[in-house]
From Swiss-Prot:
Residues 387-455 form the TRAM domain. Binds 2 [4Fe-4S] clusters. One cluster is coordinated with 3 cysteines and an exchangeable S-adenosyl-L-methionine. Residues 9-128 form the MTTase N-terminal domain. This is Ribosomal protein uS12 methylthiotransferase RimO. Its cofactor is [4Fe-4S] cluster.
Amino acid sequence: MKQETAQNKKVHFISLGCPKNLVDSEIMAGTLMKDGYEVVGEADQADTVIVNTCGFIEDSKKESIQRILDMSDLKQEGKIKKVVVAGCLTQRYKDDLVEGLPEADLFVGSGEFQNIAKILKNSDEGEKQKTFFNLPTYLQEEATPRVNSQPGHRAYLKISEGCMKRCAFCAIPLIRGNLQSRSIDAIVAEAKLLVAGGVKELIIISHDFTDYGFDIRRKDPTRKESPVELLKALDQVEGLQWIRLMYLYPDGITQEMVQVIKNSTKIVKYFDMPLQHVNDQVLKSMNRKMTRDEIETALMNIREHLPEAVIRTQFIVGFPGETQEQFEELLNFVAEQQFDRVGCFKYSPEENTPGGRMENQIDEETKQYRHDALMEVQQNISREKHSDFVGKTLQVIVEGFSEETDLLLQGRFWGQAPDIDGVVLINDGQAQVGDMVKVHITDNMEYDLIGEIVVEN
């Protein structure tokens, strides 16, 4: 009988949640491929399915559980042999999850994902241990195997793990631990490798970009790791065309940082800056270490020096104790500030967080009303903002055919991040995926722009 080895075993990934979790999936895929596994695109083609879960909010947890159960059904039908549960949900609930999901074969926390090849190999050889939990202290190095799951012209670049903030609504520190920053040298080395592989756009991700390097400098004040120094170093990477920053905390956006972004031809003028609220009392309850005045100062700093900047933010409505008056202050603030993009979440109480233990929780009907009211205000703003682009020519990176029809190409201009923002639909002109082209904008929709490629003689 032929002995099965890693060289003829197939694995499929289901990666849920944020881009930071996706990078962990990419590292697991790279590690397994290096060990001889084949990564396949469909679950029923695989021997093993790894569900990299999200445990951040209630909806994410439900989705993770459902996908695990779906894969368990495939296993019961004999279509796959093994179900591995990895990621944040596993790390957060540990033994409770193991007890509640006997159908799964292995449980790998976010502190052990880097050992996935060894864990799978030992399991295949008959080892009985099925739980692998540890503190999430792992930071990838330049040589860490990784498979870029994005279109070849873009990639996520994770610069740190964990978070030093303690927002009352957030479970991330419980799951991912305290801030651990990678060195600038390691980040730049990975950036160069990605660019050498064809990447034109790097999307910089962490739990808070503006805290980058604080942990390193606290241990050794002579070290240079800081947001500004990292930006300067990445700006020197040859062949890189766009650098996109995600998850900026408002009080960390300094004038020096804004000037570095202003002076760069690579760092796109795009600020992803979750504010969560604007009322001072609600911010205090959320344990957000800022005031409305400080938020407005940060916004003024950006707009004064970069009037063309695209600002994306997100808010939480229905946090415990939020009054109608406090919500209306937020609503008026959104109308006044005219943000380019806004995401809105209904507060979800999380176990073992200060917010989850608070009294005066808001009922679901009120949360839904506030969510819908805020998004209605923002939809009108977004439509107006997009109309301002009509008649302008924008640099666009081509992503492929439209999701709606193969008759249109689809791309993004520098003010659109993948997956969370709209797109540019191109109805005239030809280009290849990954091409940077100039597009003349002829029309707009609520979240998307429409245009035609400018042919340069």
